Amino acid sequence: MRYEQPPGPGIGSTPILSVEGLRKRYGEQTVVDGLSFSVRRGQCFGLLGPNGAGKTTTLRMLLGMTMPDAGTLQLCGETIPGHAHRARMRVGVVPQFDNLDPDFTVSENLQIFGRYFGLPAATIRKRMPGLLEFARLEQKADAPVRALSGGMRRRLTVARSLINDPDVLVMDEPTTGLDPQARHLIWERLRSLLASGKTILLTTHFMEEAERLCDELCVIDNGRKIAQGKPHELITHEIGCDVVEVYGDDLPALRTLLAPLAERVEASGETLFCYARDPQPLVATLRSQTETHAMPGLRYLHRPANLEDVFLRLTGREMRD
């Protein structure tokens, strides 16, 4: 049995999740500060932000696990936190950290989780083969969870979140700690869920993940929304030009040389980021410097702007703990 649903209707016009004026304080610290956004049915919506921006706290309030200090929340037609239990029956959750039971087998983890939703044993048994196939764990059904690789455990966690056939998936950094192959497999599975009509709300630190999966993004910092839009719109609006990354032994001299040829130059560590609408003069200058060995150790990379450029422009390049 495959985990299949009728083809999804695409992205709807009615929000399945709405957040308005959400606030949360811990003592003197405001963690979420007047946050508002909505997610439409069938959409993949991404929450982006540096560490401590308020992403996980926002998810906890959406699920009724943390009480907001102000604001309104609606999830699957239910008011949160008043009817959080009813809403959660229609939601699947993929937490940031693994919370599978290592003493049980793959199948037992699915069975036990299904009971939390009050599902009949027959319903759980009917859904399990499709979920195991979805996670590519058919051959591991009777294996203990502790024997699985990190990628297998993460796929099982995603499959487990589907046991109640949810309308919405809430995913907190779903591919953290995975190697590239495992990450791409998770992305493939998430795209199939979106195609079937599921709605996904995710947080992630992987900008490529957000750019590949998300229909819309909300960037938050210090608990506030600082930008929202489709990935390509954010790239065009916030960056709007090509990027040339420059590495060399003498960054001050390189900056002096290149600044007149770029709209903007930013330094981060041992790298200069040069933003240019017409990058050819800049690239030609770098090529000349490389060919004549005028600047030892000089290397450069010319590329289109991407979502990571947007993220760093909006939130800064300083390290966050």
Curated annotation (Swiss-Prot):
Membrane topology: Peripheral membrane protein
EC number(s) recorded for this UniProt protein: 7.6.2.-
GO CC terms of this entry: plasma membrane
Occurrences of domain ABC transporter (ranges): 17-247
One Pfam family, short name: ABC_tran
Alphabetically ordered keywords of this record: ATP-binding, Cell inner membrane, Cell membrane, Membrane, Nodulation, Nucleotide-binding, Translocase, Transport
Binding site for ATP: G49, P50, N51, G52, A53, G54, K55, T56
Coiled coil: none
Family annotation (PANTHER family): ABC TRANSPORTER ATP-BINDING PROTEIN, ABC TRANSPORTER ATP-BINDING PROTEIN NATA
Function (record text): Part of the ABC transporter complex NodIJ involved in the export of the nodulation factors (Nod factors), the bacterial signal molecules that induce symbiosis and subsequent nodulation induction. Nod factors are LCO (lipo-chitin oligosaccharide), a modified beta-1,4-linked N-acetylglucosamine oligosaccharide. This subunit is responsible for energy coupling to the transport system.
Subunit structure: The complex is composed of two ATP-binding proteins (NodI) and two transmembrane proteins (NodJ).
Protein name as catalogued: Nod factor export ATP-binding protein I
Organism, as annotated: Ralstonia nicotianae (strain ATCC BAA-1114 / GMI1000) (Ralstonia solanacearum)
Gene from which this protein is expressed: nodI
